[in-house]
């Protein structure tokens, strides 16, 4: 079962058993809370024997010495604490949680010599613990061969810090962020037989409880709007498509909205241009962009963000039945532009093209950002350490890059240009949906650019980061929830009134 934590913050606390976590900076002679947890000063000797120096994310796990009110003590290094940023506190919390899988009661002492602890730092530490502890086990009926699944009580965690009032306030926001990330992870991890377009739309509809206005457009309504590109992808599946429009109105009425658009291919076989069988199961995650947008809208509403925001997700399934679109078909998008389908596995851009045009045409937002697990080519270029960033606006691109540095959901800016635009010209239509093997992620972005007019726009290709990324202190899950924290930081730093 995944570990659930129940947090409280206190200026002082004497553990009554359980695990005491003591933070220690590199080079410091004493850890946080040592006077309480180690009254006979035994830990310094244990640290010397264990060669524990306070290096960032290093730990030393010991049975509590005589006289300690705790049963077990974990020393947690935070490195050179003067340079700790938000992400460092998150990772420290994640590293602590990784050592505490079997704990029933935890006390964390943050205020160590040489460490400046703000309320936000304390809240980030707690969020880091939650992010590390997340796991998706909805369909596991047994823990092991002989142990039945049981309901687990939350582990009580007391965080000891002088910044109690600020920490409690900051933790409310941190919890909202965590909820959005976990929602995105849940959606990506769900199997496609459970989460089709209709079911995904229903999950998004639940955001109404937080004050988000949610509209769900049916196939018939999209047909009336002329969304031939999106509907062409969907026509091979027996499961009807949906377009979900989410609005959070937390800003002033006169303020233009910021808009986020997500690709939501709930399962991608490739269609008639079918994918190889090996690894196709991962294509349940081809809706990672839509998951991130839905998670972001949850965050903005839950923390009452002072911004007007729009989230639009195009939900389809790409299947190869007798009514599926074929290579060589020509479809007409909502914009009126025609598209020759060269490869039915280049379907995400067709979905996004109509969604982007619809968003711009109806809402006229101040900016649009789309997220999509769009191309394997971006993984060839950047592996799974960075997402690709494409933009027609330098200011927006710089804001996104800065948000990526804060959250460590990192972006790398890629080019756009007329040379690439020519690669998607078609002999039979206004454009074709693939430009060939070379520059595949760039030509995909160039395709999307034809649907945004002059609106400041950015495209995030998250194919390498939304799912299957290497696990770390903050993510032990296949679905990462990439993009939720990044875009929340973007909004927080630049667009809240």
From Swiss-Prot:
Phylogenetic classification of the source organism: Bacteria, Pseudomonadati, Pseudomonadota, Alphaproteobacteria, Hyphomicrobiales
Family listed: Belongs to the peptidase M17 family.
Functional description taken from the UniProt entry: Presumably involved in the processing and regular turnover of intracellular proteins. Catalyzes the removal of unsubstituted N-terminal amino acids from various peptides.
UniProt cross-references to PANTHER family, sorted A to Z: CYTOSOL AMINOPEPTIDASE (PTHR11963:SF23), LEUCINE AMINOPEPTIDASE-RELATED (PTHR11963)
Protein residues bound to Mn(2+) 1: 268, 345, 347
Main localization category: cytoplasm
Cofactor comment text: Binds 2 manganese ions per subunit.
CDD domains named in the record: Peptidase_M17
Compartments, record wording: Cytoplasm
Domain of life from the UniProt record: Bacteria
Pfam families referenced in this protein's UniProt entry, alphabetically: Peptidase_M17 (PF00883), Peptidase_M17_N (PF02789)
Binding locations of Mn(2+) 2: 263, 268, 286, 347
MF-aspect GO terms: manganese ion binding; metalloaminopeptidase activity
Organism listed in the record: Sinorhizobium medicae (strain WSM419)
Gene behind the chain: pepA
Cofactor list: Mn(2+)
Protein name: Probable cytosol aminopeptidase
EC number: 3.4.11.1, 3.4.11.10
GO BP annotations, alphabetical order: proteolysis
Catalytic activity: Release of an N-terminal amino acid, Xaa-|-Yaa-, in which Xaa is preferably Leu, but may be other amino acids including Pro although not Arg or Lys, and Yaa may be Pro. Amino acid amides and methyl esters are also readily hydrolyzed, but rates on arylamides are exceedingly low; Release of an N-terminal amino acid, preferentially leucine, but not glutamic or aspartic acids
Entry annotated with the keyword Kinase: no
Gene Ontology annotations for the cellular component aspect, listed alphabetically: cytoplasm
Alphabetized UniProt keyword annotations: Aminopeptidase, Cytoplasm, Hydrolase, Manganese, Metal-binding, Protease
Active site residues of this protein: 275, 349
């Amino acid at each position: 079962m995944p570990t659930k934590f129940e947090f409280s913050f206190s200026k002082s606390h004497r553990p009554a058993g359980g695990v005491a976590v003591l933070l220690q900076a590199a080079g410091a002679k004493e850890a946080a809370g040592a006077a309480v947890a180690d009254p006979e000063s035994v830990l310094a000797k244990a640290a010397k024997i264990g060669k524990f120096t306070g290096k960032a994310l290093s730990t030393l796990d010991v049975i509590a010495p005589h006289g300690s009110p705790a049963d077990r003590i974990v020393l947690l290094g935070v490195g050179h604490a003067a340079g700790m940023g938000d992400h460092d506190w998150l990772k420290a919390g994640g590293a602590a949680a990784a050592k505490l899988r079997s704990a029933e009661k935890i006390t964390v002492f943050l205020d160590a010599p040489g460490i400046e602890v703000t309320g936000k730092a304390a809240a980030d530490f707690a969020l880091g613990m939650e992010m590390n502890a997340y796991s998706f086990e909805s369909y596991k009926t047994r823990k092991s061969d002989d142990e039945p699944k049981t309901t687990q009580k939350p582990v009580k965690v007391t965080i000891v810090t002088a910044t109690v009032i600020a920490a409690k306030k900051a933790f409310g926001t941190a919890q909202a962020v965590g909820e959005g990330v976990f929602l995105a992870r849940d959606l990506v991890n769900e199997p496609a037989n459970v989460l089709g377009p209709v079911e995904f739309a229903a999950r998004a509809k639940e955001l109404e409880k937080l004050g988000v206005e949610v509209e769900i457009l049916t196939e018939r309504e999209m047909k009336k709007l002329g969304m031939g590109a999106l509907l062409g992808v969907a026509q091979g599946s027996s499961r009807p498509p949906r377009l979900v429009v989410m609005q959070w109105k937390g800003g002033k009425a006169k303020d233009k909205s910021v808009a986020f658009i997500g690709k939501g291919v709930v399962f991608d076989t490739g269609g008639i241009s079918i994918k190889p069988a090996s690894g196709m199961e991962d294509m349940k995650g081809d809706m990672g962009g839509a998951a991130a947008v839905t998670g972001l809208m949850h965050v903005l509403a839950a923390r009452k963000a002072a911004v007007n925001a729009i989230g639009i997700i195009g939900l389809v399934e790409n299947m190869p039945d007798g009514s599926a679109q074929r290579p060589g078909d020509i479809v007409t998008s909502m914009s009126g532009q025609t598209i020759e389908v060269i490869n039915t596995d280049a379907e995400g851009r067709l979905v996004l093209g109509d969604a982007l045009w619809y968003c711009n045409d109806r809402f006229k937002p101040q900016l649009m950002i789309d997220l999509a697990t769009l191309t394997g080519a971006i993984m060839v270029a950047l592996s799974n350490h960075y997402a690709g960033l494409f933009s027609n606006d330098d200011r927006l691109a710089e804001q996104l890059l800065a948000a990526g540095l804060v959250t460590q959901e990192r972006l790398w800016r890629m080019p756009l240009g007329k040379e690439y635009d020519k690669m998607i010209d078609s002999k039979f239509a206004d454009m074709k949906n693939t430009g060939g093997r070379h520059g595949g992620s760039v030509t995909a972005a160039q395709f999307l650019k034809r649907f945004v007019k002059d609106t400041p726009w950015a495209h995030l290709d998250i194919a390498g980061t939304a799912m299957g990324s290497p696990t770390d202190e903050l993510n032990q899950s296949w679905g990462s929830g990439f993009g939720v924290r990044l875009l929340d930081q973007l909004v927080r730093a630049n667009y809240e009134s």
